Amino acid sequence: MAGPDQHYEPAIDKRDFDDHRPLLHDIDTGIDGTGDGRLRSDSRLSAFRNLDGGSDGLLNDVVDEIVERDRRKMAMEVMRVCSFAVGVISCLGAGSITAFSLYGPLFLTRLHYSQLQVNAVSIAAEISMYLPVPLFGYLCDRYTPSPLALLSGLVFGGGYLLAAFAYRSGPLPEAGGEGWPPWVMVVAFVAIGTATSCMYLAAVTTCAKNFGRGKHKGIMLAVPIAGFGLSGMWQSQVATYLLCERREDGSRGDVDVFRYFLFLALFLFCLGVIGTFGLRIVDEEEDQYIDEAVEELERSGLLEESEFFRPRSEVQAAYGTFSDAADGDAPGPELSLTLSEEEREAARLEKEREEEERRKKNWLLNFETRLFLQDQTMWWLAVGFFLVTGPGEAYINNLGTIIQTLTPELHPPNAPSPAGLPSTHVTIIALTSTIARLLTGSLSDFFAPPATHLFPANIESGRRSSQSGPTAKRPTLSRLAFLLPSALLLSLGYLLLSSPLPLQHPGLSHVTTALIGLGYGSAFSLVPIIISVVWGVENFGTNWGIVAMVPAAGAAMWGVIYSRGYQDATDGGNGSPDGQCHGWRCYGFWAVGCTLSVWVAVVAWILAWRGWRRRGVVV
């Protein structure tokens, strides 16, 4: 029993309630009729209201945070898609050098360059296009693609302007003209080649970093690379049908090289400015790649624990376990900081954190570059790429003169060549290489097994567990299973060219061009994809830039071999009064050498594949 000075708290039973009585009626009036119960009830209701208001505030905060997170995620997706679109557009313009064979023969007939001088111009462009790629890739990895895009626009504009006025100056002095010396044209095409690599690498690196870990990384890389091949096609058509000379009867003649170069100078300058603002790498994705790469190196044992990856705050905290505030309740000096001092301290810590992240990123990328260069399989891959792309570059650059060698010497001068127009062959090689790049990129995505050597175990296990039943049972094919047959198609094109058939049936040269376009496009699509799969995307610009140097040497070597054979055949009795060569000797031995080169490349790639399989690397 309760004492007289104690409040009686009645027991509540479900039978004490009816439908017409307030739930707190007895408590509000009190058992003895006083208002004490109401006071306690008021405080209790106030607490309930405060709790309810706090819950609403917390819920609103959670909702606002979710909305803000979704907004940021949507903004990043929009940025990623827009950057991809700008990257594809940049590649659609960057490959202007692939239309060199459209106006290369005019350097022979209009400017009276020798075949060696024409090849010197094309080789200078090839070397300047490929040799600086590691430097530009390094800048893309450590900074952003935007400065490279701006540089490409400026250099493109200056290079094509110089080439336009060098062509307009006319024939060489030794041919009775007042034209500028050939080295001026060489300088112009060195600038054009440099700008080509700038714009191409800025666009491809942006796409690789923004989509490098998705399940569609192959097609997202193949599309801009395919756009690079298509640029020569549409630009050659514009030159042939819009920027061409007109004969007296109103028919179309040769391309107006001066106007064509002016058009490219203005167009590519504007494209570089657009890329400056449009090529963006989503920072969150890049930070994720860096962190995952560090974790993978630590798990593999290649990266031992180092004080370099310990933030300075952790090192400083190791000097003392307890703070001064733990010794007593007296406020320490830290508690007396003003708001401005706290803000400065927070800014200093944030700056230190950003500096640590930057140093970590640079150290990791340099470390991965060393690992890449020490990998023997990389060298086999690069050797094969050298042996495949060198003949391909030489064929594309000399396509115009190869067509003329298949034309009978007694053929009417103004009649179309039975082997086809240079613009037609440029279009064929652009279309076939584009189809090959898109097909190999998409099919390799569909059939290639999932990579397990670059992801942390928990991420990859989650991906495997999320796969559906039909996907798990789908047959898998390595990307090398697409690369090797493509190389054999390429060798078949050279083998057909080296046979007597194209001389008897010049129309077969279209088949040769199509086969070479298929093999050449597949190599340029699959090799960067393989590099991103085997060595990751965090250092993709540098890694791909190192391998992308080798076509420069290949193009120079096979270009010199072709021009030497062409000139020897011309001097040996196969030349015509206009300086052009006709017959098998002009190109035959070169075509045989290209066939053998591609076969050796297949062997080198098989050796690289064996090395990856031995290490458990899924390609």
Swiss-Prot record:
One Pfam family here: MFS_1
GO cellular component: fungal-type vacuole membrane
Annotated protein name in UniProt: Probable transporter mch1
Location of the protein in the cell: Vacuole membrane
Domain of life: Eukaryota
Function: Probable transporter.
Signal peptide residue numbers: none
Transmembrane segments: 88-108, 120-140, 147-167, 184-204, 219-239, 261-281, 377-397, 428-448, 480-500, 515-535, 541-561, 589-609
Record flagged with keyword Cell wall biogenesis/degradation: no
Membrane protein topology class: Multi-pass membrane protein
Family the UniProt entry places it in: Belongs to the major facilitator superfamily.
